[in-house]
Curated annotation (Swiss-Prot):
Lipid-attached positions, GPI-anchor amidated serine: 152
Highest classification ranks of the organism: Eukaryota, Metazoa, Chordata, Craniata, Vertebrata
Induction: By viral or other interferon-inducing stimulation in most cell types (at protein level). Down-regulated by ebola virus GP protein.
GO molecular function, one term: metalloendopeptidase inhibitor activity
A GO CC term attached to the entry: Golgi apparatus
Protein name as it appears in the record: Bone marrow stromal antigen 2
Domain note: The extracellular coiled coil domain forms an extended 170 A long semi-flexible rod-like structure important for virion retention at the cell surface and prevention of virus spreading.
Taxonomic source organism: Mus musculus
């Protein structure tokens, strides 16, 4: 036969019956009372929280929370629209700034061209004055000269040279 090894000593049957009787029922009774008390406590707490959750103050708080949430969403939408408008305004400002810079550069070019043209006009006016003076000098020489043919030939050459020179200056 196999060896019997038990962690406890064998107890006669008549002793086991006495322990399981009243002591065992007490433990079950204590456990049942604890379970009932726990259940009653849970029911009372549930009723208390249900009453508290349905109270006027709680409903007012929930209503205020919903209003705050709605106001927050409204403000967020307004902020988004404002930021979009600001971005558009900045884009337009940048475009306007580029246009202003381009127009300033164009104006500076036109001013420099106008100054160059004025300088060229002054130069040509001086040249015309000089040529008029030479023409006057040639007329005086003509009057003082004794021969009419020589004077008329030379004045014709000088006149044609002056016309050629003035036309060349005006072209360039």
């Amino acid at each position: 036969m196999a060896p019997s090894f038990y962690h406890y000593l064998p107890v006669p049957m008549d002793e086991m019956g006495g322990k399981q009787g009243w002591g065992s029922h007490r433990q079950w009774l204590g456990a049942a009372i604890l379970v009932v008390l726990f259940g009653v406590t849970l029911v009372i707490l549930t009723i208390y929280f249900a009453v508290t959750a349905n109270s006027v103050a709680c409903r007012d708080g929930l209503r205020a929370q919903a209003e705050c949430r709605n106001t927050t969403h409204l403000l967020q939408r307004q902020l988004t629209r404002t930021q979009d408008s600001l971005l558009q305004a900045e884009t337009q400002a940048n475009s306007c700034n580029l246009t202003v810079v381009t127009l300033q550069e164009s104006l500076e070019k036109k001013v420099s061209q106008a100054l160059e043209q004025q300088a060229r006009i002054k130069e040509l006016e001086n040249e015309v004055t000089k040529l008029n003076q030479e023409l006057e000098n040639l007329r005086i020489q003509k009057e003082t000269s004794s021969t009419v043919q020589v004077n008329s030939g030379s004045s014709m050459v000088v006149s044609s040279l002056l016309v050629l020179k003035v036309s060349l200056f005006l072209l360039f």
